[in-house]
């Protein structure tokens, strides 16, 4: 059975939602890992959850990037293993240099909490294959600093390498090129502002978030059986 690690920083608040989605809905092993830990040995994937790590002082994710667990996360990613950063987790990944660009305050300068339609821009990743031919999904967003920014050279590289995975249909926050989620060039690290863990059962209003985790699980099963 696949094992997911969910690092918990002071101020994380979506960690239990993430573990619930993985354990109870997807029936895989998921453990909460304290930010003070220094090893991810034995795990197959890592998910950095949403929240307000270290109170989002300085910048969102800026202090979490220096947590004791982060060298292990960086090594995990550099080894080609799946890493997902959701909302604050995305911010941490950019601060850690695992993903390009940065997350700024929303253009409206207001916290946004709503469902947001997304276009799947690349179906051929370890995070999106389960969506098949589905072109559009809807996921909840909840952030004050979700406005993705990168310079023109970085945007050109993201497009050339097909690293833009999710795009807002109706850009809620001012993100460059409507970007809602990107991967690293190797394709094993995903950062996204929307919350797939909040869309995993119909009592929550949608199951559109399941495909991301189902894709990762399927990709690792292929590796195991290869």
Curated annotation (Swiss-Prot):
GO terms for cellular component: cytoplasm. Keywords: ATP-binding, Cytoplasm, Glutamine amidotransferase, Hydrolase, Ligase, Nucleotide-binding, Purine biosynthesis. The keyword Cytoplasm applies. GO terms for biological process: 'de novo' IMP biosynthetic process. Residues 4-226 form the Glutamine amidotransferase type-1 domain. It catalyses: N(2)-formyl-N(1)-(5-phospho-beta-D-ribosyl)glycinamide + L-glutamine + ATP + H2O = 2-formamido-N(1)-(5-O-phospho-beta-D-ribosyl)acetamidine + L-glutamate + ADP + phosphate + H(+); L-glutamine + H2O = L-glutamate + NH4(+). Part of the phosphoribosylformylglycinamidine synthase complex involved in the purines biosynthetic pathway. Catalyzes the ATP-dependent conversion of formylglycinamide ribonucleotide (FGAR) and glutamine to yield formylglycinamidine ribonucleotide (FGAM) and glutamate. The FGAM synthase complex is composed of three subunits. PurQ produces an ammonia molecule by converting glutamine to glutamate. PurL transfers the ammonia molecule to FGAR to form FGAM in an ATP-dependent manner. It is found in: Cytoplasm. This is Phosphoribosylformylglycinamidine synthase subunit PurQ. Its EC number is 6.3.5.3, 3.5.1.2. Pathway: Purine metabolism; IMP biosynthesis via de novo pathway; 5-amino-1-(5-phospho-D-ribosyl)imidazole from N(2)-formyl-N(1)-(5-phospho-D-ribosyl)glycinamide: step 1/2. Pfam families: GATase_5. InterPro entries: Class_I_gatase-like, PRibForGlyAmidine_synth_PurQ. PROSITE patterns: GATASE_TYPE_1 (PS51273). It comes from Lactiplantibacillus plantarum (strain ATCC BAA-793 / NCIMB 8826 / WCFS1) (Lactobacillus plantarum). Disulfide bonds: none annotated. Part of the FGAM synthase complex composed of 1 PurL, 1 PurQ and 2 PurS subunits. One of its GO terms (molecular function) is phosphoribosylformylglycinamidine synthase activity. The active site is at 87 (nucleophile), 195, 197.
């Amino acid at each position: 059975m696949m094992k997911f690690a969910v690092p918990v920083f002071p101020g994380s608040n979506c960690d239990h939602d993430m573990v619930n989605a993985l354990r109870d809905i997807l029936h895989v092993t998921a453990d909460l890992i304290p930010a003070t830990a220094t090893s991810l040995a034995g795990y197959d994937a890592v998910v950095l959850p949403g929240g307000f790590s270290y109170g989002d002082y300085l910048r969102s994710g800026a202090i979490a990037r220096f947590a004791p667990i982060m060298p292990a996360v960086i090594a995990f990613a550099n080894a080609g293993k799946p890493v997902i950063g959701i909302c604050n987790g995305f911010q941490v990944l950019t601060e850690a240099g695992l993903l390009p660009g940065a997350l700024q305050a929303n253009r409206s300068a207001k916290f946004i909490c709503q469902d947001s339609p997304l276009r799947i821009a690349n179906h051929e990743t370890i995070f999106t294959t389960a969506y098949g031919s589905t072109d559009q999904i809807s996921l909840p967003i909840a952030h004050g600093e979700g406005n993705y920014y990168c310079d023109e050279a970085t945007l050109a590289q993201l497009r050339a390498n097909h690293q833009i995975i999710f795009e807002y249909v109706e850009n809620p926050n001012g993100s460059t090129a409507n970007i809602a989620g990107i991967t690293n060039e190797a394709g094993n690290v995903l950062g996204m502002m929307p919350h797939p863990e909040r869309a995993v059962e119909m009592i929550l209003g949608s199951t559109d978030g399941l495909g991301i985790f189902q894709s990762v699980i399927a990709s690792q099963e292929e590796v195991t059986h290869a």
